Amino acid sequence: MAMFDEDVGCDATPQLLSRRGALLAGLAMAVVVQPAMSRPHKGLRVLFICQSGTAKSAIAREVFRRRARQRGMAVTVFSRGIVLADHVSPPLRRKLAADGIDPAADPATVLERRDWQQADIVVAFNPLPGEVRPLHLRDWSSLGSLNDDYARARPDLDRRIEALLDEIASDDRRASP
């Protein structure tokens, strides 16, 4: 009685797997288990808010979306502005294009009550209006201007996004049985 189908080429007995069979079984487990472990909080909603809705929040949305996708994380990410205005300068637009980031990928939208009420995590780049009181707020108002100093602000934004993704993934691992 063989443990594996002979068509696969593994002739291990029930008592002992060959090294090749054990290696193949281990690789198969890694391929099957790893993607499931890297998909935290299916349906988690992350909201980025900045004053204009077109610069920091929109850029963070696109960077977060890309990084979450690379990690295989199923999260919804969106951005809003307190008062809409186009604050992406032509030099910043060129730098973003060179990095493959399109802050206009989603239309700029003004912040509404339902946005922050439906979000699981809210990241604010500016002080929020008094009536906006999200439960899980991250204050990123200390991030420098992407228009004025992209070379310094972008790596800072990247670090913050990676830390938030790590936190979400860590929370998911703790919540999984």
What do these predicted ranges mean?
Residues 1-17, 31:
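N-terminal secretory signal peptides
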Residues 16-24:
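N-terminal export leaders
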Residues 33-35:
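N-terminal signal peptide c-region/cleavage motif recognized by signal peptidases
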Residues 39-112:
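Conserved active-site segments centered on acidic
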Residues 116-117:
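A short, aliphatic-rich alpha-helical micro-motif
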Residues 120:
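Conserved acidic residues
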Residues 127-177:
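Phosphate-binding/catalytic loops
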